[in-house]
Amino acid sequence: MAEHVIIGNGVAGIKAAETIRKHDPDGKITMIGDEAYAFYYRPQLPEFVAGKIEEDRLWGKKKDFYEKNNITSHLGKTVTGIKPDTNEVILKDNTAINYDSLLIATGGSIKRRNYPGSDLNGGIVQLKTIDDAKNIKEKVKSAKSAVVVGEDFLTLSLTEALHSSGLKVTYLLRGDRLWPEIMDKDASDILLLRLKGKGITIKQETDIKEVYVKNKLIHGIITTDDELIDCQILGIVDKLQPSIGFLNESGVNTDNGVLVNNKMLTNFDNIYAAGDVAQLPADLDSDIPEINVRWLKAWKQGQVAGSNMAGNDAEYDDIASISATQICGIDIVSIGVSNPLNGDYKIMRGDYPHPEIDVYKKLVLKNDRVVGALFIGNVQEAREVTKVIKNRTNYSEIDKKLLKQMFDLNSRFGTFHGFLCPVCKLELPIPPDAKVGDKITCPACGIELNVTEKMLK
Ligand SMILES: Cc1cc2nc3c(=O)[nH]c(=O)nc-3n(C[C@H](O)[C@H](O)[C@H](O)COP(=O)(O)OP(=O)(O)OC[C@H]3O[C@@H](n4cnc5c(N)ncnc54)[C@H](O)[C@@H]3O)c2cc1C
């Protein structure tokens, strides 16, 4: 009987476990995760912090899921090393667990930059785990204001969550724009306007010079412009770094993340990696190897890895870099190379940006082929454009109706009546005969939802 071991109890790990169980009903499955909780929906943490949803809406699996599926779980346990020569995983308490096939699905952890005074942990927060979310909710009770510094979408999520919790929030951007990985300046300006409209103070090209601490408590920060800003909560967020430290002595090939091929296989023939920790080769001629934080990507890669661990021959053939989210009520979808930095790319963006409309759409071409796209505020054509990019279509071959709908402001709102899945944030098709209270399942990530009046509007 095969022994499958999965390190990481996030979406990539859980999807792999479910897939293995489907293909190998009798195989032994062991899951190890350092968070002491059953699987939960990480992208819903900001809404939980903001008090928009209760804790019970976070759970993706009940505690008895593991027992019911004959999975041995070690939750709250940390893996400190693996030994491919003896097929062993080593836990912090030195327990060794044997495997025939192993999945590394350890995601990433938020790197925090240090500033003078920031070694005092008291008021400094981050939002990655359910424990982080609970910690923030507790601190918000006695706080009036917060400062957040950073530019990518984890920082944006934290900023929005703190603001929605009722705090006065100042957001420091070290550069001139938000989320530079996917956004050009015009796209970023649309979102910045929305954040300002909500009452969030934005300071661009400003960093922290010093954290102002009194009686071991954070009282504020001093900016690089020598301004003192009061705050009791401080969010410092840098990029998510793949959690690969425990692989140092293992011989598993890593770069930024664990290097895998499109079967999610590492350089060992029985060790796989999937999700935020995995690094696929560059796709779409982008020169940029992809390892970005994306729920749906982790979900699909877990499925491919699980299938292969159970003896199949599955391949991950999606675009590695699709990102869908919602910030301040604005839908954002980025596909492929959405913000190229060198001059080999051509940008098509029709009538956008427009000073009065907070919608923005663009296509990125390389040698006439569409290699990337960005949608802000209206994501109506995102699914169609994903197919265009995946099929390596030339710009001249794209359906003219699709281009008109994307770029012609007169048809900008077209017929989109979609609803975005609260977990994977991709369009959720609502059946035409759906009624309030019916149950529907997101075809992309599998979450089950009750149909509400809002969805039917
Ligand atoms: C606040 C927030 C909002 C987000 N919003 C969106 C969104 O709107 N859209 C979107 O597409 N994505 C979003 N994401 C990103 C998305 O959640 C991730 O891409 C996804 O969770 C990655 O899944 P994973 O299984 O690869 O890793 P993870 O979900 O990070 O799970 C990995 C697990 O492995 C554990 N682990 C790590 N090291 C060890 C070890 N040595 N031993 C044992 N266990 C270990 C970790 O603690 C963790 O529990 C959001 C993330 C956050 C934090």
Question: Predicted regions: what is each one?
Answer:
Residues C421-C424, C442-C445:
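Short cysteine-rich clusters marking metal-coordination/redox-active sites
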Residues A2-E3, K22, V277-E381, F413-F419, ...:
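Mid-to-C-terminal Rossmann-like scaffold of FAD/NAD(P)H-dependent oxidoreductases
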Residues L120-K141, N215-L217, I222, E227-V304, ...:
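FAD-site-proximal beta/loop scaffold in flavoenzymes
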Residues P429-P431, N450:
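Short functional micro-motifs and their immediate structural scaffolds
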Residues D26-K28, S73-I90, I97, S164-N261:
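A Rossmann-like FAD-binding core segment of flavoenzymes
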Residues A2-T72, F153, A161-I182, V423:
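Beta1-alpha1 glycine-rich phosphate/pyrophosphate-binding loop at the start
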Residues M1-V5, W59-V147, E205, I222-D226, ...:
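FAD-binding core/adjacent interface of flavoenzyme oxidoreductases
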Residues P431-T441:
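Short linker/helix segments within small regulatory modules
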